[in-house]
Amino acid sequence: MIQSFTRLNVADNSGAKEIMCIKVLGGSHKRYASVGSVIVASVKKAIPNGKVKRGQVVKAVVVRTKKEIQRKNGSLVRFDDNAAVILDAKKDPVGTRIFGPVSREVRYANFMKIISLAPEVV
C-alpha cells in the first residue's frame, strides 16, 4: 500500500534512484496505490547525467510492494521493497532496463512494455 509521502526505489535505469509519492491517480479521493497503480512522484535521489533529475515531478507505475497482494487463487505475493518504474507521457517506461522481479498484476494493468523488459514476472 503506497500513499502520499511514501518513498519508493526506482526499478529502472532512468537515472532516478528514489522517488516520493505525491498523489495516487484514479478516482477523486483514492488514498492507496497497489501494484499496477499509477502515481505522481517527485525524484528524491538521482544519479548525475541521468534522464530524470532530482526534484523533477514524474509519473510512475508501482511494480513491487511490501504489503502482500492476494491473488484470486488464494496465494499471497509480497516483495522485500516498494519499487516503481518511471513513465513518460505515453505511459511507456523512460528507462530501457528493468531491475528485479515484477508482479503479474502489472500485466493486468496493461503495461506490456514493462513486462517484456522485466527479467522475472512473479
From Swiss-Prot:
GO terms for cellular component: cytosolic large ribosomal subunit. CDD domains: Ribosomal_uL14. One of its GO terms (molecular function) is large ribosomal subunit rRNA binding. Keywords: Ribonucleoprotein, Ribosomal protein, RNA-binding, rRNA-binding. GO terms for biological process: translation. It comes from the Bacteria. The keyword RNA-binding applies. Pfam families: Ribosomal_L14. HAMAP family: Ribosomal_uL14. Belongs to the universal ribosomal protein uL14 family. Part of the 50S ribosomal subunit. Forms a cluster with proteins L3 and L19. In the 70S ribosome, L14 and L19 interact and together make contacts with the 16S rRNA in bridges B5 and B8. Binds to 23S rRNA. Forms part of two intersubunit bridges in the 70S ribosome. This is Large ribosomal subunit protein uL14. The gene is rplN.
